[in-house]
């Protein structure tokens, strides 16, 4: 019968860290321990499985072998019999094949590329629309200026790894074959630091802050990301640096709202202007422009001003500015103004004057019909 996957036995993912594995083992071991389940053969068998899985997954060499070859790594005298070395060496015949399949290969493992960094940049709407150049200061890892990235104390050199003899790989028995595995002693680098640099302690990198000038193109919006190649953390022992990603966040504007490449704003007008029409000034990002408001304009009407929006960062036509009219009810009226409005209302035929207020007529006709239907 096929053996159960070790990760499934412990209930952890294949990327689980050692502390997660230990925590899962402790919980399951307490549950299935023979002392707590005396005479229960199933619990005893389960406890053995848990212990076996724990022993493999907390041993870095055994876990690496299991991840690549599964249970076969420990069968037919695999790692359990002799570990590294010994046995028939078919690496010249099968080395490239196993290297391609399992990601190992026979060459030395490359030093790790530096990590990518992220910087959150807040922009005003004006900066986002027009583009801007900003200086930023970021904490990062840079090459040690004492050992120049080698990790070794000045005057010394990294030593060849005695386990893999500088290849970064060791042979591991897999059934009838000997296949290549990353050296667990030097982690595939092929060298060891005997006398580490006093400044970087053998890492080849030190923490520093650096200042960069970042050019933000016109038209960016919240969520856009700008990549600065090679401006991330420097890699280990001379490996390439990672990248820096600048994440854009545009601040809320007191007047405009942005949707895609269009801008929206609310323009208040008094009811006399709405009824009679006229000309008003409206704001744009380039200054004030005149807008002609026709008579009988209702609240919510949109006026489109073409080309007054945002030019797309990806090219194409410039967006528009859409002005939404809001008709304001006057406040703080004096007696004369109230009298004039009263006369105006009476000239309409009362509060629900039908001739001059078609929407009011439609509304009250609907209300009347509703109550008429209820009384039938």
From Swiss-Prot:
Database matches in Gene3D superfamilies: DnaJ domain, Heat shock protein DnaJ, cysteine-rich domain, Urease metallochaperone UreE, N-terminal domain
One of the GO biological process terms: protein refolding
Zinc finger (CR-type) in chain: 131-209
Binding sites annotated in the UniProt record for Zn(2+) 1: 144, 147, 197, 200
Ranges occupied by CXXCXGXG motif repeats: 144-151, 161-168, 183-190, 197-204
Cofactor dependence: Zn(2+)
Function, in words: Participates actively in the response to hyperosmotic and heat shock by preventing the aggregation of stress-denatured proteins and by disaggregating proteins, also in an autonomous, DnaK-independent fashion. Unfolded proteins bind initially to DnaJ; upon interaction with the DnaJ-bound protein, DnaK hydrolyzes its bound ATP, resulting in the formation of a stable complex. GrpE releases ADP from DnaK; ATP binding to DnaK triggers the release of the substrate protein, thus completing the reaction cycle.
Domain-level remarks: The J domain is necessary and sufficient to stimulate DnaK ATPase activity. Zinc center 1 plays an important role in the autonomous, DnaK-independent chaperone activity of DnaJ. Zinc center 2 is essential for interaction with DnaK and for DnaJ activity.
Subunit structure, as described in the record: Homodimer.
Family named by the database record: Belongs to the DnaJ family.
Name used for this protein in its record: Chaperone protein DnaJ
Naturally occurring in which organism (per UniProt): Shigella dysenteriae serotype 1 (strain Sd197)
């Amino acid at each position: 019968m096929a053996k159960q996957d070790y990760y499934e036995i412990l209930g952890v993912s294949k990327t689980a860290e050692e502390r997660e594995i230990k925590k899962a083992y402790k919980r399951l071991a307490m549950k299935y321990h023979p002392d707590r389940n005396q005479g229960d053969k199933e619990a005893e068998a389960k406890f053995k499985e848990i212990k076996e899985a724990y022993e493999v997954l907390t041993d870095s060499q055994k876990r690496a072998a299991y991840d690549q070859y599964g249970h076969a790594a420990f069968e037919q005298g695999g790692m359990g019999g002799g570990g590294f070395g010994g046995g028939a060496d078919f690496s010249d015949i099968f080395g490239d094949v196993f290297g391609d399949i399992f990601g190992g290969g026979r060459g030395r493992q490359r030093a790790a590329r530096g990590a990518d960094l992220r910087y959150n940049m807040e922009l005003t709407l004006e900066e986002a629309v027009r583009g801007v150049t900003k200086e930023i200061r970021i904490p990062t890892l840079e090459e040690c200026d004492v050992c120049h990235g080698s990790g070794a104390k000045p005057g010394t050199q990294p030593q060849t790894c005695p386990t893999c003899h500088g290849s970064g790989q060791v042979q591991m028995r897999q059934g009838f074959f000997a296949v290549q595995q990353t050296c667990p002693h030097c982690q595939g680098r092929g060298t060891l630091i005997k006398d580490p640099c006093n400044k970087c302690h053998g890492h080849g990198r030190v923490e520093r802050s650096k200042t960069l000038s970042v050019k933000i193109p016109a038209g960016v919006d919240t969520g856009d990301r700008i990549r600065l190649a090679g401006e991330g953390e420097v890699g280990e022992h001379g490996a390439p640096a990672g990248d820096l990603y600048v994440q854009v966040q545009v601040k809320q504007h007191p007047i405009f709202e942005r949707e895609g490449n269009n801008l929206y704003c609310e323009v208040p007008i008094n009811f006399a202007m709405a009824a009679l029409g006229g000309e008003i000034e409206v704001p744009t990002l380039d200054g004030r422009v005149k807008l002609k408001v026709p008579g009988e304009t209702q609240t919510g009407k949109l006026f489109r001003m073409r080309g007054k929006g945002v030019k797309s960062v990806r090219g194409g036509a410039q967006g528009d500015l859409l002005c939404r009219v809001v008709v304001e009810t006057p406040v703080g009226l004096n007696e004369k103004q109230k009298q004039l409005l009263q006369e105006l209302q009476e000239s309409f035929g009362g509060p629900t004057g039908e001739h001059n207020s078609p929407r009011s007529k439609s509304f009250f006709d609907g209300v009347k019909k509703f109550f008429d239907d209820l009384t039938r």
